Amino acid sequence: MAFNDLLKQVGGVGRFQRIQVTLVVLPLLLMASHNTLQNFTAAIPPHHCRPPAHANLSKDGGLQAWLPQDTQGRPKSCLRFTSPQERPPFLNGTEANGTGTTEPCTDGWIYDNSTFPSTIVTEWDLVCSHRALRQLGQSLYMAGVLIGAMVFGYLADRLGRRKVLILNYLQTAVSGTCAAFSPNFTVYCTFRLLSGMSLAGIALNCMTLNVEWMPIHTRAYVGTLAGYVYSTGQFLLAGVAYAVPHWRYLQLLVSVPFFAFFVYSWFFIESARWYSTPGRLDLTLKALQKVARINGKQEEGAKLSMEVLRTNLQKELTMSKGQASAMELLRCPALRHLFLCLSLLWFATSFAYYGLVMDLQGFGVSIYLIQVIFGAVDLPAKLVCFLVINSLGRRPAQMASLLLAGICILVNGVIPRDQSIVRTSLAVLGKGCLASSFNCIFLYTGELYPTMIRQTGLGMGSTMARVGSIVSPLVSMTSELYPSLPLFIYGAVPVAASAATALLPETLGQPLPDTVQDLESRRRGKPRRQQQEQQKQMVPLQASVQEKNGL
């Protein structure tokens, strides 16, 4: 398309692209930390009831006299005796005296702070009858991501990618910092919800702003770079959480850097492609000329003019007279087809992904080690995904990553629970495939939707992903019916969803669509022929420049 020619005219992948892409993806390091932060800030340490205030432990026979034990000889977490017992309450799985009555922990709990000195669980006693509140914080965070995906995806198509990114950086910095100083759990949840909203906007606009400034052949590199930065953030979280085990300091440490991101984001250059779609050619020209200067192509930038842009962006200007709305995703057949297929892919990826990564304490090994392993597996997985994306295409990469992830999880469901090494290995492999699926779906979605509704489409896709992340914890409760049932559900959904990829067009080597007409031509299977006909009707860029300058 003509816009890709304009990008080549002002330097292709030059100094500007390298600088802006680096600065835009840098916040993804800490976005990964926020997404799984509650694995550490809401970790549940071993705990037991606090004895009554009037208890005399030296006279009563010690702390154990007040604590009933389970069949493995460990103190029960949520019960204590109403009066001290003369001997251990359980012996070989049976109660020793048979007369000890128990009661809830009315005087609070004593926590083992050796691994987690301070978490929201220990500070606000989110255990026993209040245990469900622990998940509420994560659920509200994910609900915020869902809301943010819809709101900021829509606003980015109306106000531009740069303005929304600036707002998102500031909101994340303020809400994340305030969460660290929360006086109670209600305030904490409120600020976590606001953080989720803004981080959703960052994820969406980071990818789009970068992709819209890159030539066709380099878009996959941008998507892969963003994925690797996110994976590196998982390593970063494990190290930072180990060094800073206090939840308030950890929350503060992953939030304050967004103030710096907010400051330098004012120097971002808005997407010239977005400017051209609403028909603001004067701003498009200024943006392209500024990029040309940064890339050392000042002469080529000076040759651009309003007349050249009108000639080469004729189709975009014609179609921009009517702004697309979110309802177009359902009203237009081509967009509806994309929306339904991509929604299923987004939902399945997130549903299975968060089913694995938000249960790190369930592996029975160091939570820090599992966090590192889960981050490490992303590196080779995303490298393979990148090679497939660039050689075979987006569609086979998306299908294979979902299919393999689902198979790993399904097989995990039939492995005996005492085979911890095999089960953990399968979970790690499945997580790597799902991380690759996320990497691919961001790029694939951005390339499938036309410019005028690209952010709205990405926002709706991310919304479906958040629905998956909210539903995922509910599925884990089915383990009460059958221990492996959650794994069967987590595995079946991505396997079934992978079939939807076959209904989508391939975008490898294809120009970004700007209009619904481009989608219709893809559905007819004639994108390249239509492109050739357009090129015959359109005045070539170089010829226009030469004519303008009397050459």
Curated annotation (Swiss-Prot):
Keyword Membrane tagged: yes
GO BP field: prostaglandin transport
Residue spans, topological domain Extracellular: 45-135, 188-195, 246-248, 359-368, 417-425, 506-551
Transmembrane segments: 24-44, 136-156, 165-187, 196-216, 225-245, 249-269, 338-358, 369-389, 396-416, 426-446, 485-505
Gene name in the database record: SLC22A6
Residues annotated as glycosylated: N56, N92, N113
Additional remarks: Involved in the renal transport of a variety of drugs with well-known nephrotoxic potential, therefore may play a role in the etiology of the drug-associated nephrotoxicity. Uptakes the diagnostic agent PAH/para-aminohippurate and clinically used drugs. Mediates the bidirectional transport of PAH/para-aminohippurate.
Topology feature Cytoplasmic, residues: 1-23, 157-164, 217-224, 270-337, 390-395, 447-484
Modification note: Glycosylated. Glycosylation is necessary for proper targeting of the transporter to the plasma membrane.
Coiled-coil regions listed: none
Domain comment (free text): Multiple cysteine residues are necessary for proper targeting to the plasma membrane.
One CC-aspect GO term: basal plasma membrane
Protein name per the record: Solute carrier family 22 member 6
Catalysis: reaction(s): (6R)-L-erythro-5,6,7,8-tetrahydrobiopterin(out) + a dicarboxylate(in) = (6R)-L-erythro-5,6,7,8-tetrahydrobiopterin(in) + a dicarboxylate(out); L-erythro-7,8-dihydrobiopterin(out) + a dicarboxylate(in) = L-erythro-7,8-dihydrobiopterin(in) + a dicarboxylate(out); L-sepiapterin(out) + a dicarboxylate(in) = L-sepiapterin(in) + a dicarboxylate(out); prostaglandin F2alpha(out) + a dicarboxylate(in) = prostaglandin F2alpha(in) + a dicarboxylate(out)
Organism lineage string: Eukaryota, Metazoa, Chordata, Craniata, Vertebrata
Keywords, ordered alphabetically: Cell membrane, Glycoprotein, Membrane, Transmembrane, Transmembrane helix
Keyword Transmembrane helix among record annotations: yes
Compartment(s) where it occurs, according to its Swiss-Prot or TrEMBL record: Basolateral cell membrane; Basal cell membrane
Primary role: Secondary active transporter that functions as a Na(+)-independent organic anion (OA)/dicarboxylate antiporter where the uptake of one molecule of OA into the cell is coupled with an efflux of one molecule of intracellular dicarboxylate such as 2-oxoglutarate or glutarate. Mediates the uptake of OA across the basolateral side of proximal tubule epithelial cells, thereby contributing to the renal elimination of endogenous OA from the systemic circulation into the urine.
One of the record's GO molecular function terms: sodium-independent organic anion transmembrane transporter activity
Family affiliation: Belongs to the major facilitator (TC 2.A.1) superfamily. Organic cation transporter (TC 2.A.1.19) family.
